[in-house]
Amino acid sequence: MKHVLASTAAGLMALGLASSAIAAGLSPEEQIETRQAGYEFMGWNMGKIKANLEGEYNAAQVEAAANVIAAIANSGMGALYGPGTDKNVGDVKTRVKPEFFQNMEDVGKIAREFVGAANTLAEVAATGEAEAVKTAFGDVGAACKSCHEKYRAK
């Protein structure tokens, strides 16, 4: 139970951080670093779910990880793509392609699909049904992939 609470708290911290990024006056470097940290933490939680689906299923771990993913997805990460974050800044590297900033309507559509898939994953994970989680997990992965293929450099 402590793990579930800790993971959820971490996700909620990411939620607050991302949505207040611009208001806090983060530099382009800080915006890039913050969004990368959010995506890295989300990826770690995706890995946790995958490990549970491939091995012994622990419903509490899956639910905690899914809640973190949903919290980050709903955190307003778009605020971390401000002016000057479209390229490497100093020692801070980004893999976002310039096309990302030129196709905001498409990016918004992909983001909404991702948020919906992440929310569904969290809802399904709460049921503890591994097969349903597997399907919802695949949908989240597909949503991630759709953005990565178009807007993330290799």
Curated annotation (Swiss-Prot):
Signal peptide bounds: 1-23
Database matches in InterPro entries: Cyt_c/b562 (IPR010980), Cyt_c_II (IPR002321), Cyt_c_prime (IPR012127), Cyt_c_prime_subgr (IPR015984)
GO CC entries: periplasmic space
Domain of life: Bacteria
SUPFAM superfamilies per UniProt: Cytochromes
One Pfam match: Cytochrom_C_2
One GO BP annotation of this record: electron transport chain
Binding site for heme c: R35, Q36, R95, C144, C147, H148
Gene Ontology MF: a single term: iron ion binding
Post-translational modifications: Binds 1 heme c group covalently per subunit.
Keywords carried by this UniProt record: Electron transport, Heme, Iron, Metal-binding, Signal, Transport
Gene3D superfamilies: Cytochrome c/b562
Function of the protein: Cytochrome c' is the most widely occurring bacterial c-type cytochrome. Cytochromes c' are high-spin proteins and the heme has no sixth ligand. Their exact function is not known.
Subunit organization: Homodimer.
Name assigned to this protein: Cytochrome c'
Source organism of this protein record: Allochromatium vinosum (strain ATCC 17899 / DSM 180 / NBRC 103801 / NCIMB 10441 / D)
Taxonomic lineage of the native organism: Bacteria, Pseudomonadati, Pseudomonadota, Gammaproteobacteria, Chromatiales
